[in-house]
From Swiss-Prot:
The keyword ATP-binding does not apply. Flagellin is the subunit protein which polymerizes to form the filaments of archaeal flagella. This is Flagellin B5. It is found in: Archaeal flagellum. The keyword DNA-binding does not apply. It holds the Pfam family Arch_flagellin. InterPro entries: Flagellin/pilin_N_arc, Flagellin_arc. The lineage of its organism: Archaea, Methanobacteriati, Methanobacteriota, Thermococci, Thermococcales. PANTHER family: FLAGELLIN B1 (PTHR35903:SF1). Belongs to the archaeal flagellin family. One of its GO terms (molecular function) is structural molecule activity. Signal peptide: none annotated.
Length: 255
């Protein structure tokens, strides 16, 4: 009887151990499956972060002065494309940061919440580009009295000038250079996708030593300028150039 009881007890203990091991194995399998899925999701997210981003493909500066060497760069054109493998980049969430070592300016695109009463279409042009930096003299820009419907690149420049000088808005404009799928034509949320190219255009009004734009502003010769074009997600495009020691042309390639 005793041996039988001991045998039954041993069997019960053995069965209990098997059940505990089975439960533990189930927990381990479930946990490993969860961790595997989590790792795969994290890997995909990391890959997307690395691949996503924006690239600066060129920067041009413009001075309206005659001769050019007597003036400063008052306008910049920053050409951007998406990184290879990048998803769509909403330019409405992009920031352009510029610094000359004395100040750091942060430009943004139109925002429906911050810019109520304005239209996104004031700051984007998607037609043929005859000249991306049309000439303006002081009378042309100082006489701008309101926003205007955009029918040319010049209209975007004038609207940006008015926004900065009259409404104190740090805005950049967008000129569509290449856009096969029309993703950049959505003025409220222009999206830079594969094969697309856009020009971010901006005035250098913040680069003014006496805070009075009416008597001159801009980036002088031999000035080191650094910055970034920062998307909402992914890697930012690098801005890093030094302006020429002498401005010999009105339009200059800077980077």
């Amino acid at each position: 009887m005793r041996r039988g009881a001991i045998g039954i007890g041993t069997l019960i203990v053995f069965i209990a151990m098997v059940l505990v091991a089975a439960v533990a194995a189930g927990v381990l399998i479930t946990t490993s499956g969860y961790l595997q899925q989590k790792a795969m999701a994290t890997g995909r997210q990391t890959t997307q972060e690395v691949a996503s981003g924006i690239r600066v493909s060129g920067i041009y500066g413009y001075t309206p002065s005659n001769p050019p060497g007597s003036g400063k760069i008052t306008r910049l054109v920053v050409y951007v494309t998406p990184n290879a493998g990048s998803g769509g980049i909403d330019l409405a969430h992009v920031r352009v940061v510029l610094s000359d070592g004395k100040r750091m300016a942060v430009y943004r695109y139109y925002d429906s919440d911050k810019d109520q009463g304005l239209q996104a279409g004031y700051f984007l042009y998607a037609g043929d580009i005859e000249n991306i930096v049309p000439y303006f003299n002081d009378t042309d820009v100082l006489s701008v009295s309101n926003y205007t419907t955009v029918t040319s690149v010049a209209d975007v420049w004038k609207n940006l000038y008015y926004a900065m000088t009259q409404d104190n808005k740090m805005l950049f404009g967008i000129v569509v250079v290449a856009d096969d799928d029309d993703s950049l034509s959505n003025t409220a949320h222009p999206t830079l996708g594969f094969g697309d190219k856009a020009a971010l255009i901006l005035w250098t009004i913040p680069f003014d030593d006496d805070n009075d734009y009416s008597n001159g502003y801009g980036i002088p010769p031999s000035t080191k300028v650094v910055g970034k074009v920062i998307p909402e997600n992914g890697a930012g495009g690098v801005i890093d150039f030094t302006t020429p020691s002498t401005y010999t042309d009105n339009l200059m390639e800077l980077q």
